[in-house]
């Protein structure tokens, strides 16, 4: 069977706990399906600043480039909030995206039937929600130049630049159409074309790409309307594609449809090298080390790795089935407590999912689907 080398970057806060859980589940996949996963660890974010003096050490970058895929935990925390801009933990995340050419961020948003009551929205709004946000990662206002703060004539000013090249827009929109073709065949392109020149270019390019996918429907939606529609009628969406900052904001909003940020995985795909997988949630320093963190987003990110980087579809389905089974049995970490069920620790949730992976059979999955 397969041999796969995975770079693990725990990062800060609960990143260490949730990546540890995902690694344990991947080890169970290896045992169940006969694969060998090799895990090698690197520093990123605040942990890297403390130990190496930089948010992304060269050793970490080298490790990632030599690996088949990257599993990331989370970066950041109040400890580093007063650092100068180049020594902020988030700079490590932005840098690794740029260095590995991680141009497409995929964030599935699914509301599990057993977690409908965990969402702050009415059950009839969220039950059956299943869409993907495709966020452009390497362009836009987070990377545009000039960027910074200056003092001119005694007045302090700050500037950021929202810049997109046509080819950057084209490749992310194309990715969205390819995804939609295998789903419900609808792409919603989100922009601010009534105000921003970059969004007008975005809309024009989306129209050009759409001509190559006549079987897929394209609609345009202004970002402010999209933010409202995600709450008003989330089931209308299939694939949402948008620029970097809009995607950053909308995906956090969409997380509440599933009940918790702790449920949302993500994949950041590279055009030429290893892709990176990480939970959408942050480092949550307030609960770090307390065995309270929800590991499911990290575990589902590992499932995305199995499917997208390694082509191991059955193995990914085994992990997803194990997560669904744990939730159906009423297990809940503290972030999901309002939905009822038995509150368990991080380690207990991981152990339950591991056991389900080891016991997994395709027949068991079929029986669950048709039960």
Curated annotation (Swiss-Prot):
Biological or metabolic pathway of the protein: Amino-acid biosynthesis; L-leucine biosynthesis; L-leucine from 3-methyl-2-oxobutanoate: step 3/4
EC primary class: oxidoreductase
Compartment(s) where it occurs, according to its Swiss-Prot or TrEMBL record: Cytoplasm
Native organism: Geobacillus kaustophilus (strain HTA426)
Cofactor, free-text remark: Binds 1 Mg(2+) or Mn(2+) ion per subunit.
Binding site for Mg(2+): 224, 248, 252
Gene Ontology biological process terms in this record: L-leucine biosynthetic process
The protein's Enzyme Commission number: 1.1.1.85
Name this polypeptide is given: 3-isopropylmalate dehydrogenase
Primary localization class, coarse: cytoplasm
NCBIfam families, per database record: leuB (TIGR00169)
PROSITE patterns from the UniProt entry: IDH_IMDH
Reaction(s) catalysed (UniProt annotation): (2R,3S)-3-isopropylmalate + NAD(+) = 4-methyl-2-oxopentanoate + CO2 + NADH
Subunit-structure text: Homodimer.
Residues noted as binding NAD(+) in the record, renumbered to the chain: 77-90, 282-294
Family: Belongs to the isocitrate and isopropylmalate dehydrogenases family. LeuB type 1 subfamily.
SMART domains: Iso_dh (SM01329)
Cellular component, GO, one term: cytosol
Listed InterPro entries: IsoCit/isopropylmalate_DH_CS (IPR019818), IsoPropMal-DH-like_dom (IPR024084), Isopropylmalate_DH (IPR004429)
Function: Catalyzes the oxidation of 3-carboxy-2-hydroxy-4-methylpentanoate (3-isopropylmalate) to 3-carboxy-4-methyl-2-oxopentanoate. The product decarboxylates to 4-methyl-2 oxopentanoate.
Cofactor(s) essential for the protein: Mg(2+); Mn(2+)
Site (Important for catalysis): 142, 192
Membrane-spanning parts: none
Molecular function terms from GO: 3-isopropylmalate dehydrogenase activity; magnesium ion binding; NAD binding
Residues engaged in binding substrate: 97, 107, 135, 224
Pfam families named in the record: Iso_dh
Sorted UniProt keywords: Amino-acid biosynthesis, Branched-chain amino acid biosynthesis, Cytoplasm, Leucine biosynthesis, Magnesium, Manganese, Metal-binding, NAD, Oxidoreductase
């Amino acid at each position: 069977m397969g041999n796969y080398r995975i770079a693990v970057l725990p990062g800060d806060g609960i990143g260490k706990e949730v990546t540890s859980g995902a690694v344990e589940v991947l080890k169970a996949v290896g045992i169940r399906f006969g694969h060998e996963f090799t895990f090698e660890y690197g520093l990123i974010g605040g942990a890297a600043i403390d130990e190496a003096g930089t948010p992304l050490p060269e050793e970490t970058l080298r490790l990632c480039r030599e690996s088949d895929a990257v599993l990331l935990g989370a970066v950041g925390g109040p400890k580093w909030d007063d650092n100068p801009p180049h020594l902020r933990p988030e700079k490590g995340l932005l840098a690794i995206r740029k260095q590995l050419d991680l141009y497409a961020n995929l964030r599935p948003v699914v509301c599990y039937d057993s977690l409908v009551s965990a969402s702050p929205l009415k059950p009839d709004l969220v039950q059956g929600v299943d869409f993907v946000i495709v966020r452009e990662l390497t362009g836009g206002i987070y990377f545009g130049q000039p960027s910074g703060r200056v003092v001119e004539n005694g007045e302090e000013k700050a500037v950021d630049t929202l810049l997109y090249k046509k080819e950057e827009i084209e490749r992310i929109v194309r990715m969205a159409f390819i995804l939609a073709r295998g789903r419900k065949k609808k792409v919603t392109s989100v922009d601010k074309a009534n105000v921003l020149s970059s969004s007008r270019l975005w809309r024009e390019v989306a129209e050009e790409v759409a001509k190559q996918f006549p079987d897929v429907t394209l609609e345009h939606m202004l970002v402010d309307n999209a933010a409202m529609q995600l709450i008003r009628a989330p089931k209308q969406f299939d694939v949402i594609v948008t620029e970097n900052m809009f995607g950053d904001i909308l995906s956090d909003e969409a997380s509440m449809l599933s009940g918790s940020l702790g449920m949302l995985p993500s994949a950041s795909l590279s055009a030429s090298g290893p892709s990176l997988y990480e939970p959408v949630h942050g480092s949550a320093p307030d609960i770090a080390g307390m065995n309270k963190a929800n590991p499911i987003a990290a575990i589902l990110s590992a499932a995305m790795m199995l499917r997208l980087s390694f082509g191991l579809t059955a193995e990914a389905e085994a992990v997803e089935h194990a997560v669904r089974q744990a939730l159906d049995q009423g297990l809940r970490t503290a972030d999901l407590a309002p939905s009822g069920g038995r509150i368990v620790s991080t380690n207990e949730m991981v152990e339950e999912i591991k056991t389900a992976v080891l016991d997994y059979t395709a027949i068991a999955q079929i029986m669950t689907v048709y039960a």
